[in-house]
Amino acid sequence: MKDTGKEQNHSSFEDTSASEESFKSPKVNKGEKGMARAEKVRAIRKACATRDVEALAAHATSEGGLLEDDLRQIAWPILLRCDEQRQQFDTVSSPELLRHVDEEQVELDVNRSFVYYPKAPEEEMLRKKQQLSNLITQVLREYPMLCYFQGYHDIVQVLLLVLGEKQAVPAVAQISLFRIRDYMLPSLSPAVKHLHLIPSIIETTDPELRRHLGNIEPFFALAATLTLYAHDIQEYSDISRLFDFLLAREPVVAIYLFAAMILSRKKELLEIPADEPEMLHFTLSKLPHPLDLDGHILRAARLFEDHPPESLPLGAWKHIPWCSVLKTSRDPHGKYTAADAVYLFEKQSQQIRSEERRKRALDFLWSHRRSVGSVALAILVGAASFYIRKRGLDASIWSYVGRIQRAIQTWV
């Protein structure tokens, strides 16, 4: 993380204790809490009935999120606009579609799924794993250009457990096309570009902490952001609550969430010497413990509102391609179809191939710079000689060379 040396007005994240206190809810007795919960349940149901996405997003961000799985089963498909996919997936299995190239890896990962939750008899777990395999396979066969990545199954298993097998099919398709599309490209380079937003968010909010982290590359956030935190969070109640928030907001907010977690750990990170980057990287790669999920969610929402992507320093947002899911999702009123997502996927794939060709060419030139330089010089001299002879300037030039030679001899 390069230090720009600029000091500007920043949000009050530096006073960690004060900001922590501001996110704590006022103490209420059990009766008041029960009444507030019941009122929130009614409000969520009303928002679902009227398909009020803004109200649902507000409830998903507030303490406790959408509260219960039966509410999530109504709200999540609305947030993900699953109606657009339902007609495309009439059945749970798609044997008529061609086998996807990544299905072997899918099976390996499915066998390692459901590590932390749910706690169920072996027979039930085998059934869940088969459902998970069917679910992933169907979506990949329907959209064969998508590249499976290890950790995708962590995301899908959350959708499966909350929504059930049938409802999860369009939800998985929607989240793949409109939220994690960049992660399903043939290369991880787009995901790395996402990560470089994190130093910019830290820079604009807490330059002191950003300087302390120095030039540490933000790869420490890859596993968490790639899997929407499903790989790292071990409690089902926590990950389902976090998905309330992530599904209600645009994709880039998942990056802001990781930045918010870093900012909340300022004191801990400053205690680690700056000349121990390995220890800093190790600490940053682990989520805070204990995990104050509601607090981190509120911080992330505030960070995003105060410092939207377009305002970030270090040019990080400019490096995100126009066809990235982060940019195409910035318009809250944009109505993209699955066909649009496929088109954008192909455009970004073309960009990746172009970048890779350019990088290979530059690497070749650098590794052969001496021989390439000699050839280039020879070509330049030859071209200059041809130009001089063609213009009839050779006699004049040799005349000047003779004068210079005589002047040097006289001076010596």
List PLM regions with ranges.
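N-terminal transition regions in large eukaryotic proteins
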Residues: 1-140, 335-412
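Extended, Lys/Glu/Leu-rich amphipathic alpha-helical scaffolds
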Residues: 31-34, 105, 173-220, 251-340
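Acidic, Ser/Thr-rich intrinsically disordered and amphipathic helical segments
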Residues: 39, 55, 70, 74, ...
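Coil-to-helix interface segments in alpha-helical RNA-associated scaffolds
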Residues: 53, 84-86, 201, 234-239, ...
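Amphipathic alpha-helical segments within well-ordered protein domains
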Residues: 57, 76, 137-140, 156-160, ...
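Active-site-adjacent structural elements in folded domains
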Residues: 120-125, 136-142, 205-215, 223-228
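Extended serine/threonine-enriched, polar tracts that run as long, contiguous segments within proteins
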Residues: 230-235, 244-249
